[in-house]
Amino acid sequence: ADAAASAPGTAGDVVLLKPAASVVYLNGGAGRPEAEAMRRDAAHWPLRIAFQGAPGPVAGVHLAVADARGHTLLRLAHGGPMTFVMLAAGDYRVTASYHGHAQTREVRVGPEGQDLDFRWTP
């Protein structure tokens, strides 16, 4: 792999790890090696989000994570198939939209972390 492919924030053999304002997130899982790498690291992330469509995992999800006061902490235009977010314990609102179909979930992140699954079916 060339240097650009292995640099943080670029596509390649590594998953993407990027800071967004004060929130660090990991987004990827499109290929089998990338998905397996993310699953191995999942326990280290307080909020673990997966996106599924009718045939399987989907990417290109519009994602927003807001705190209990409504302040947006993370906004992605191309989330998935998995997005892990480093958050402090607390209450959050997560909104995910795929092909114009939005879903919103209220989630409490605690010491064990929290898994969220968003599914879109025809």
Label each PLM-derived region with a short phrase:
Residues 87-90, 108-110:
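Hydrophobic loop/turn residues within beta-sheet-rich immunoglobulin-like superfamily modules
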Residues 80-86:
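Short, surface-exposed beta-strand/beta-hairpin micro-motifs centered on an aromatic residue
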Residues 73-78, 108:
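Short beta-strand segments within Ig-like beta-sandwich modules, predominantly Fibronectin type-III
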Residues 2-61, 98-122:
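Primarily secretory-pathway and cell-envelope proteins
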Residues 90-96:
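A short tyrosine-centered beta-strand micro-motif
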Residues 62-73:
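Short amphipathic beta-strand segments in non-cytosolic proteins
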